[in-house]
Amino acid sequence: MHNVSSSKPTINEIGIVDVAFGRDVTVVKPVNMYGCTIGDDCFVGPFVEIQNNTKIGDRSRVQSHCFICELVTIGEDCFIGHGVMFINDSFEMGKPARGHKELWVPT
């Protein structure tokens, strides 16, 4: 039998913070969306993360389990399928810019 601690875990909830939504947007929770812009008539499915300075164009669909990193722009009328990941992967140095955000460029 395991000992059960009476202490409570730290639970961090992000949810939806500082998001600019267009008209007629549908979001299915749970999601993590922060500092991004979502165009008119968009759909965002569950278990999606959309980070700072990201733009999703009008009438675009982001299906479940997607990850969209900072500084990514998705155009109008796009369909982003289940589990797609957009990362800021411009490797001008020949290696990832991990830890050096000043080297990130919009994609």
Describe these PLM feature segments.
Residues 2-17, 26-107:
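Flexible, glycine/small-residue-enriched loop-and-beta-strand segment within the central core
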